[in-house]
Amino acid sequence: MSFVGGSMISPGGAEANEYNQKKENNPTRGLYIAEDKDGKPQPTVNLMMRHGVRSALEYASSKDLQKALAVRNPELAPHLTFYDAGGHGYATVRVDAGTMVTEFVCIPRPLERSPGVDGGPLRYRVRHEVPLWQAGERPQMRQTVVEGDAGLAV
């Protein structure tokens, strides 16, 4: 069981793709980024890494996550349950004798300082819970979107 986190405040690859993946004459753009139904950029690289090329391209074309997941490659990256190349925030880890719980807490892109003392708005909070497993068994992870919308990350 492992979790990898990136930077809390530095721009990541998903944000860079908004600027370096040009819309014109770029047939591979949909693998990295596409606009949703409201015209906001979405990191289709999350879909590509978890579900495959067809899923990313389907989302870029249809703007429909369910259609994109319907054409997923279930053999791709079976070890990944969550991937957010454009998230900002932090993770907490709690471990006791029977369970490990990791929560990813994501905030909107921090373009300016939050005026409140509460740290500002939340984009999503996703919990990954793994009960203790026995030698020779595979760990079983339960993922729950506790708050917000994790978008293309799940």
Question: Can you annotate each of these PLM segments?
Answer:
Residues 1-154:
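Long, structured stretches of catalytic cores involved in phosphate-ester chemistry, encompassing
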